Amino acid sequence: GSPKYCHLPADPGPC
């Protein structure tokens, strides 16, 4: 996942 898109379930980031 990308930190920029960590709010998206499809790309969970280190949030």
UniProtKB/Swiss-Prot annotation:
Primary site of residence: secreted
Tissues showing expression: Expressed by the venom gland.
Domain named BPTI/Kunitz inhibitor: residues: 6-15
Keyword Disulfide bond annotated: yes
Top-level division of the source organism's lineage: Eukaryota
Record's GO cellular component terms: extracellular region
Keywords carried by this UniProt record: Disulfide bond, Protease inhibitor, Secreted, Serine protease inhibitor, Toxin
GO molecular function, one term: serine-type endopeptidase inhibitor activity
Subcellular location: Secreted
Keyword Disulfide bond appears in the UniProt entry: yes
Function field: Snake venom serine protease inhibitor.
Record-stated family: Belongs to the venom Kunitz-type family.
Record's protein name: Protease inhibitor
